[in-house]
Amino acid sequence: MAVYNYDVVVLGSGPAGEGAAMNAAKAGRKVAMVDSRRQVGGNCTHLGTIPSKALRHSVRQIMQFNTNPMFRAIGEPRWFSFPDVLKSAEKVISKQVASRTGYYARNRVDLFFGTGSFADEQTVEVVCPNGVVEKLNAKHIIIATGSRPYRPADIDFHHPRVYDSDTILSLSHTPRKLIVYGAGVIGCEYASIFSGLGVLVELVDNRGQLLSFLDSEISQALSYHFSNNNITVRHNEDYERVEGLDNGVILHLKSGKKIKADALLWCNGRTGNTDKLGLENIGIKVNSRGQIEVDEAYRTSVPNIYGAGDVIGWPSLASAAHDQGRSAAGSIVDNGSWRFVNDVPTGIYTIPEISSIGKNEQELTQAKVPYEVGKAFFKSMARAQIAGEPQGMLKILFHRETLEILGVHCFGYQASEIVHIGQAVMNQPGELNNLKYFVNTTFNYPTMAEAYRVAAYDGLNRLF
């Protein structure tokens, strides 16, 4: 058994692990990275964020070709199979792996591929694919092993027609009809992707509203666009059992309804990847979702062991995970990079996409904050008209007395990019966070960004 000594060992090479390893390495620490896959990037790169967003991009291009009158003059609509579209995602994954492998090499982070588990509070044992065991001693260890889809024991995920958000990438055909169980972020994104490929989608939601954490107006807009694009949403429904057939699947609901489709995609919940870490050897406990509890410094109940990313739960976003990992390492190296990551933008890559930051109307009303609303509808924006993307809006919530921006909510073309302008202003201290910034700033024309000026004027016109 080979033995190595490090200042910091990071378990998991997803966004959280990468952020942690890079920060520690740049602070002069000797760092090792352990990942169970033979390539870096974690589930984000190989199974989650990157492939699903690459799929979405390709599907949007197909949709634009099939609906744009200019392209219709060239030829007939074209339809692509899911495996064909997936090829573009595979190319992006390869490029991401190459880039990230280079990051570790340039920063002299040692990579170990294999299953890592705790022998004690300062020792990680890595079982390599060839069976060799390597022992890593470390002053500090950061757990960033991510999460995986939750799989109820009563559902046969080995059935060839039953998938989760990891295994859906192995789908070898394009179903005519698909059941998506779970209308969270992942479920809504995949519902959009398959709908864009011409698949009839049944989206089963066990709640009464899509993505209820969003501003209600944005949630309602998403519901409208879903119903307008071959996505049937069934609210307040819970599964009773899943019946696998030779040529499809039947979902039995507790309400007595039955839905038959060519395949079922399970998108209801995620579980932290902690079961193989040997946490029982160091006294760290996990909750019912397999997640680790940490304090504001991202420290676990064991002082020299930290956690970051999906494995600690909320907000389970790749962007936040990277910052959490960087902050966890910042707590170790004490270079001023620590911060508690709590106010992050939400990006939801449905078609059209959604992004938001700050408070929504429901929260401000409940808190009795005197706010006002400014809106800009994309159908009136020159850039949206040029791009043929008239659906959507930008919504700014601000304090009617101080003009402080309290929340920004965007639905439509480039929403996940547009939101960062509002985020930058909201992060300014004191009176610099002011709605009038958008009135007094010159925006390029035509751009989607100028929606901020339109929305600001709309909001100011509501004041009296």
Swiss-Prot record:
Q: Name one GO biological process term.
A: NADP metabolic process
Record Pfam families = Pyr_redox_2 (PF07992), Pyr_redox_dim (PF02852)
Which cofactors are reported in the record for this sequence?
A: FAD
The main enzyme category here is oxidoreductase
Recite the UniProt keywords alphabetically. Cytoplasm, FAD, Flavoprotein, NAD, NADP, Oxidoreductase
The subcellular localization recorded is: Cytoplasm
Q: How is the cofactor bound?
A: Binds 1 FAD per subunit.
Which positions bind FAD? Answer: 35-44
Q: Where does it sit, as one GO cellular component term?
A: cytosol
Q: Which InterPro entries match?
A: Class-I_Pyr_Nuc-Dis_Oxidored, FAD/NAD-bd_sf, FAD/NAD-binding_dom, FAD/NAD-linked_Rdtase_dimer_sf, Pyr_nuc-diS_OxRdtase, Pyr_nucl-diS_OxRdtase_dimer, STH_gammaproteobact
Any one GO MF annotation of this record: NAD(P)+ transhydrogenase (Si-specific) activity
Q: Which domain of life is it from?
A: Bacteria
Q: What EC identifiers does the entry list? A: 1.6.1.1
Q: Which reaction does it catalyse?
A: NAD(+) + NADPH = NADH + NADP(+)
**Protein's job:** Conversion of NADPH, generated by peripheral catabolic pathways, to NADH, which can enter the respiratory chain for energy generation.
Family as reported in the entry's similarity comment: Belongs to the class-I pyridine nucleotide-disulfide oxidoreductase family.
UniProt name for this protein:
Soluble pyridine nucleotide transhydrogenase
Q: Origin organism of this chain?
A: Pseudomonas putida (strain W619)
Q: Which gene encodes it?
A: sthA
